[in-house]
């Protein structure tokens, strides 16, 4: 039995299993489409060897009558790790994208709040720390978000290309979505003003999928000042902004990305 993978471009990846006879003659072939997007459950976050509950209300403030329960930074970034989930209360959920030759798992929420970019970078979680999870090697990092805003407005998103606009926004504001089966925002999710406390926006499908309202996610890029770093989300699905790399505001969050190695 031979396995065969063919990338047709535009997100179309085919897998085939080919049966061979004794003399190497192909006797049968099954072909199936491998989707370029999946929503998957994988692993849990640990601190100092203790498995942490998944934040079930991953926002800052109160929505739907419930106050957010994202845990604050525990104090030592080097003590965070990923491992097997032993219960539904701890398992993490990821948006998995197969994009050309790259496979990314992007967490569907911030896992830790009140954390600075410097905290994350000090333990190599900004640009990539290698780890093994469920027998697979990944590089754990954060998304790129664009080195500046687009068109002079923070509400217009980040300069393209960047990963937040490609995967979270799914390119919906610049044309056809990049990934047909991934969540797609509606224009009401990215207005030209802040609505970080809006109950209606919180309840819409795109925020329920990505949990961006009221909590920003640190990204890789450095802002124009040199001491600032890019954040995305919080004020809208498309919002781009900067904070000091040392700031640990309660609405600064860590949204990990696992890149398959």
Question: Can you say where each PLM-predicted feature lies in the sequence?
Answer:
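Viral virion structural and adsorption modules
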Residues: 1-31
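C-terminal, surface-exposed recognition/capping segments
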Residues: 4, 111-113, 133-261
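Short, flexible beta-strand-to-coil junctions
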Residues: 6-9, 97-101, 107-116, 259-261
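GGW-centered surface loops in extracellular recognition modules
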Residues: 21-107
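Short acidic-hydrophobic catalytic motif
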Residues: 92-93, 98-109, 121, 128, ...
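Short, surface-exposed, charged loop/turn segments at secondary-structure junctions
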Residues: 115, 121-124
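A short, surface-exposed interaction/processing loop segment used at functional sites
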Residues: 119, 129-136
């Amino acid at each position: 039995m031979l396995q065969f993978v063919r990338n047709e471009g535009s997100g179309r990846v085919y897998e085939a299993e080919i049966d061979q006879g004794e003399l190497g003659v192909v006797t049968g072939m099954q072909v199936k489409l491998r989707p370029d997007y999946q929503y998957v459950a994988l692993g849990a976050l640990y601190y100092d060897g203790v498995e942490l509950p998944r934040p079930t209300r991953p926002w800052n403030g109160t929505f739907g009558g419930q106050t957010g329960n994202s845990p604050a930074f525990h104090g030592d970034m080097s003590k965070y790790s990923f491992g097997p989930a032993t219960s539904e209360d701890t398992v993490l959920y990821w948006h998995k994208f197969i994009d050309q030759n790259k496979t990314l798992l992007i967490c569907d929420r911030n896992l830790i709040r009140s954390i600075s970019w410097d905290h994350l970078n000090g333990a190599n979680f900004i640009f990539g720390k290698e780890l093994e999870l469920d027998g697979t090697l990944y590089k754990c990092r954060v998304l790129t978000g664009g080195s500046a805003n687009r068109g002079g407005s923070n509400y217009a998103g980040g300069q393209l290309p960047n990963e937040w606009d490609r995967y979270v926004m799914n390119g919906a504001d610049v044309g056809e979505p990049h990934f047909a089966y991934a969540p797609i925002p509606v224009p009401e999710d990215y207005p030209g003003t802040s609505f970080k406390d809006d109950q209606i926006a919180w309840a819409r499908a795109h925020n329920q999928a990505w949990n961006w309202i009221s909590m920003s996610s640190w990204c890789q890029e450095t802002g124009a000042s040199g001491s600032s770093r890019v954040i995305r989300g919080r004020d809208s699905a498309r919002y781009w902004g900067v904070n000091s790399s040392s700031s640990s505001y309660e609405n600064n969050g860590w949204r990990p990305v696992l890149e398959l190695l």
